[in-house]
Amino acid sequence: MTQQTSQKHNPVLVVDFGAQYAQLIARRVREANIYSEVVPHTATVEEIKAKNPAALILSGGPSSVYADGAPSLDPQVLELGIPVFGICYGFQAMTHALGGTVANTGNREYGRTEMTVDGGILHADLEETHKVWMSHGDAVSVAPEGFVVTAHSEGAPVAAFECAEKRMAGVQYHPEVLHSPHGQEVMVRFLTEIAGLEQNWTAANIAEELIDAVCAQVGPEGRAICGLSGGVDSAVAAALVQRAIGDRLTCVFVDHGLLRAGEREQVQTDFVAATGAKLVTVDEREAFLNKLAGVTEPEAKRKAIGAEFIRSFERAVAGILDDAPEGSTVDFLVQGTLYPDVVESGGGSGTANIKSHHNVGGLPDDVEFQLVEPLRLLFKDEVRAVGRELGLPEEIVNRQPFPGPGLGIRIIGEVTEERLETLRAADLIARTELTAAGLDSEIWQCPVVLLADVRSVGVQGDGRTYGHPIVLRPVSSEDAMTADWTRLPYDVLEKISTRITNEVSDVNRVVLDCTSKPPGTIEWE
């Protein structure tokens, strides 16, 4: 699928110099309806050429170009004839490689900064003086030969430059963040007016191309199974593959006992009604609980759940083949892996492995299926757009994300049936009250976490109790790469807390997780 997409859309490559916003830059490019991918700064010139990029964007980073071991830009990259846009550290690395001057001016700029426009294409028709988001110590003091300085600030004599002839430009500030109000306009101007790219990355053609890619991978006679988790990702992946190969796809819903209240029934009704897909439900609750017995380490949990998913599918294949023509096999496994999953699992050289995603790093080495991952290069909002393009109802498309490992990674400690019942009850109360308050559209998701290995002292019924705390983790996000905690109304929080402590046994405390991502991931495990 990756090759198929790359052939039709030469990517804008975001070269990651260690920036926390590299994925956000890629998102902003896609918001401009242009396809993008992230590559590490360690990518060689030959590796970059092999991707046939439409343009390069050099990300920010925490280093100084003069520091020992600082990531550098191979000057040959700038000789490929590819449009290049530098941001913050990428702007300085670009300047350094082209023979300009980067200096420590002693005037650092962090946060909102007033910048003055001196002309050029990038900032045409914008206010002469406006706010941008800066985060730098060093600054470009002399632009490379042939480049026109188009903006400055108090701490950055060269806050932006461009060379239309070479199709290169750069800015010292961060146009990708919302704190730079005109940042997206500036990025679009580079992409369209300086780089000359077409804006043709849309939900309609994404869906069409992904369907074609699945057809090419599975072939005219291949059969596939798809594991449904109850979430939007697996639902859209299944709908795409069904559109490609029809009844040669069988969807398998594994009831692993790690589901929320009503999850199984909802999948069996909503998804089948929306797609008409063949659905087989298998009860594997006992197998999963046995596999998780005694497991407390988060990474071990994810890998155990991922491995048992595969074993469950293998056990389901025999039943599926009973209805297939004699001699048929099932060779393909469809998964709803997304681009953030790949990135967080260390998707590429030089990329940190934050945690194994059950679809990426949590699979056993002896998988008997070929993986079909039609959403592997998409962000969550793109998945929703493709789902709508395929005609899936809003009840499925707008569903809040729910991880494949389910409640198993929302119990801090060993997973037991008793603890699952406790968490399931608390989760249902939280979801019910958020829906009743009309807040579903305002939050990305609200994981409810049981601190099963923690005992909290409480007073209930005039007596001392030692119960478990429940954590509410409401977050707002665009794509799960970054997230902020959602400021829920106090009265809603109070109602959720009161109901949980009154109605859920062995829980005597409810706490709010107000950590953004970064530093914390959305899920606790």
Swiss-Prot record:
GO MF, one annotated term: GMP synthase activity
PROSITE patterns in the record: GATASE_TYPE_1, GMPS_ATP_PPASE
CDD domains (alphabetical): GATase1_GMP_Synthase (cd01742), GMP_synthase_C (cd01997)
Reaction(s) catalysed (UniProt annotation): XMP + L-glutamine + ATP + H2O = GMP + L-glutamate + AMP + diphosphate + 2 H(+)
Sequence ranges assigned to domain GMPS ATP-PPase in this UniProt record: 201-399
Any one Gene Ontology cellular component term annotated for this protein: cytosol
Biochemical pathway: Purine metabolism; GMP biosynthesis; GMP from XMP (L-Gln route): step 1/1
Alphabetized UniProt keyword annotations: ATP-binding, Glutamine amidotransferase, GMP biosynthesis, Ligase, Nucleotide-binding, Purine biosynthesis
PANTHER family xrefs: GMP SYNTHASE [GLUTAMINE-HYDROLYZING], GMP SYNTHASE-RELATED
Protein name, as recorded: GMP synthase [glutamine-hydrolyzing]
Gene: guaA
